[in-house]
UniProtKB/Swiss-Prot annotation:
Keywords: Cytoplasm, Fatty acid biosynthesis, Fatty acid metabolism, Lipid biosynthesis, Lipid metabolism, Phosphopantetheine, Phosphoprotein. The keyword Lipid metabolism applies. 4'-phosphopantetheine is transferred from CoA to a specific serine of apo-ACP by AcpS. This modification is essential for activity because fatty acids are bound in thioester linkage to the sulfhydryl of the prosthetic group. InterPro entries: ACP, ACP-like_sf, PP-bd_ACP, Ppantetheine_attach_site. The gene is acpP. This is Acyl carrier protein. The keyword Phosphoprotein applies. Carrier of the growing fatty acid chain in fatty acid biosynthesis. It is found in: Cytoplasm. Residues 1-76 form the Carrier domain. HAMAP family: Acyl_carrier.
Length: 76
């Protein structure tokens, strides 16, 4: 499973959205309906899944699916 597929799976589970709605340019808040608590839980899930750490400053830069995939790719 690719990084993007794993990110989409986590998003679909955490935000209870249809995976087909999750596009690379989808913004977590405006397109996928996430709130601030959802974002925190999502980032924690990504940290656990990929065994990485995301600082608060870095988290502020991760706004879309593509942002998350690119960030994780750089860390692995």
């Amino acid at each position: 499973m690719s990084i993007e597929d794993k990110v989409k799976r986590i998003l679909a589970e955490r935000l209870e959205v249809d995976p087909s709605e999750i596009r690379p340019d989808a913004e977590f808040i405006s397109d996928l309906g996430a709130d601030s608590l959802d974002i925190v839980e999502l980032l924690m899930s990504l940290e656990d899944e990929f065994d990485i750490e995301i600082s608060d400053d870095e988290a502020e830069q991760i706004m879309t699916v593509k942002d998350a995939v690119e960030f994780i790719t750089k860390r692995l």
